[in-house]
């Protein structure tokens, strides 16, 4: 058994059942080993950003790391934007990055690079496995690192001769680590703040915005009168009818300042004190008042559900009913296409237990409120801000949840970064409907031009934000990648085609001209 097979058997034995891959020459022994080992699903991506973004989506919906297979340093670099997003979302993944044979490195071949140096800024654990007999043990360490709560990025570098030489067989992987128990002192401090009567907000993310966490937080809010707010972007929010609703901190600085004005205390549950996404002239970086104090109830690596249970007990909220959403779904939007009408129709048509991958950008800013009373669903957001995460994320979520409908809400400019994900969706037959908002512009940047005080843009500036000339034919592009679809220009057309996509097994794309 060579080193590559030893590694694959270790991955499968350690619960890593999916490998999103874009291999090259140095990874051929790993690819060959996949044929000899049962239990590993291999999913090909035509660009490394699709591979790493899919691993992020897979972890968010399965709580289990996938492996990625990347080709040397340039392959890793091509995938780094979505590794950055996964890191910010606290998703676990095991990156297997091929390298030249150890004896070949001295010759500085064209693809040679400092892979460890490239990996380290966005990895919690990095190692180059020195020989075939070490690779299985190193693979076990990588899996253990990726499974550390709440999820970590592990990067294992696999030299070609480590893969092809005789290995030592698979290694055992230790059981997954459990979250750190919450601090009793932190719980008592939060309870004291809630009893003080001063303006207080609980800022939630992570497990706290999943169904169980929101139910507990809702009980606490009902008992104490505190406000519940989620971070502006969250890895996975469970929402819809029968669940506790939570608003998000707005992206726009002035709006966020209004939401947080007058606060004296923020209780942090998996979150950190809120700051602006970017710096803007004459606007603060901190979104909270200067005299507002932060109190950590639970860090990201701590058991947030246990912390909320303890706080619920401490404030006497255990028997309080959680304030769940019980309104009817919104009615279908009609007439001209607007953000509000789209949000209403999405909320009306979204199927039970759907997964929404949201990279709708400017068009989608109004979607959260009208989908509040939709059927129960999970909402996945971009935690790292690097665009092109939506199509890969939706792909990984669909691999993780084959029995659930995945809906991608997708801006056109961002989609062009990772459009290759459509091909993977078609090849794998993933049950995924993409709603592509085609405003033929980097529309968000038009607002940013004004926000940063850049003055009145001229022709050259506006050309940098324009995605027309030529217009992208999204239906034709999707068809060329194996995904059927339709273009719509009014709400009646959208309602019909979105419903058609939801009813169609496999991938489907609705281009919405906005």
Residue map of PLM features:
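A general structural motif
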Residues: 47-48, 107-109, 177-191, 249-250, ...
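Active-site diphosphate/adenylate-binding microenvironment
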Residues: 4-17, 22-25, 30-37, 323-403
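Phosphate/pyrophosphate-binding active-site segments
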Residues: 2, 133, 157, 270-364, ...
């Amino acid at each position: 058994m060579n080193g590559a097979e030893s590694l694959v058997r270790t991955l499968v034995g350690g619960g890593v059942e999916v490998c999103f891959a874009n291999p090259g020459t140095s990874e051929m022994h790993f690819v060959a080993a996949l044929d000899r080992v049962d239990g590993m699903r291999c999913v090909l991506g035509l660009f490394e950003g699709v591979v790493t973004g899919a691993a992020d989506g897979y972890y968010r919906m399965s709580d289990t790391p996938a492996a990625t297979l990347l080709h040397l340093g340039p392959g890793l670099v091509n995938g780094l934007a979505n590794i950055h997003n996964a890191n910010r979302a606290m998703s676990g993944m095991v990156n297997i990055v091929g390298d030249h044979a150890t004896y070949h490195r001295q010759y500085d071949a064209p693809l040679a690079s400092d892979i460890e140096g490239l990996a380290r800024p966005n990895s919690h654990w990095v190692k180059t496995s020195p020989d075939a007999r070490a690779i299985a043990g190193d693979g076990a360490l990588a899996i253990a690192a990726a499974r550390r709560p709440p999820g970590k990025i592990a990067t294992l570098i696999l030299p070609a001769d480590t893969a092809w030489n005789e290995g030592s067989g698979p290694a055992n992987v230790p059981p997954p680590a459990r979250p750190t128990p919450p601090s009793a002192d932190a719980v008592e401090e939060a309870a004291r703040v809630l009893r003080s009567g001063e303006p207080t907000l609980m800022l939630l993310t992570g497990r706290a915005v999943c169904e169980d966490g929101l139910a507990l937080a809702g009980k606490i809010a009902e008992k104490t009168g505190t406000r519940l707010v989620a971070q502006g972007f969250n890895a996975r929010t469970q929402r819809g009818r029968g669940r506790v609703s939570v608003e998000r901190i707005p992206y726009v600085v002035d709006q966020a300042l209004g939401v947080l004005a007058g606060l004296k205390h923020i209780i942090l549950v998996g979150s950190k004190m809120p700051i602006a996404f970017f710096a803007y002239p004459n606007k603060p970086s901190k979104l909270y008042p200067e005299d507002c104090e932060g109190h950590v109830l639970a860090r990201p690596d701590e058991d947030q559900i246990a912390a909320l249970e303890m706080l619920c007990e401490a404030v006497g909220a255990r028997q309080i009913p959680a304030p769940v959403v019980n309104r009817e779904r919104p009615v279908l939007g009609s007439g001209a296409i607007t953000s509000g009408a789209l949000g209403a129709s999405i909320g009306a048509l979204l199927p039970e237990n759907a997964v929404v991958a949201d990279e709708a950008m400017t068009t989608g800013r109004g979607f959260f409120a009208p989908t509040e009373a939709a059927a129960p669903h999970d909402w996945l957001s971009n935690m790292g801000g690097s665009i092109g995460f939506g199509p890969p994320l939706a792909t990984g979520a669909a691999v993780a949840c084959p029995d659930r409908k995945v809906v991608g809400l997708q801006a056109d400019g961002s989609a062009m970064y990772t459009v290759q994900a459509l091909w993977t969706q078609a090849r794998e037959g993933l049950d995924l409907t993409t709603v592509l908002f085609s405003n033929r512009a980097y529309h968000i940047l038009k607002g940013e031009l004004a926000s940063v005080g850049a003055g009145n843009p001229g022709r050259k500036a506006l050309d940098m934000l324009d995605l027309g000339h030529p217009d992208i034919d999204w239906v034709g592009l999707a068809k060329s990648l194996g995904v059927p679809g339709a273009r719509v220009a009014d709400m009646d057309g959208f309602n019909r085609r979105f419903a058609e996509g939801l009813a169609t097994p496999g991938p489907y794309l609705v281009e919405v001209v906005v």
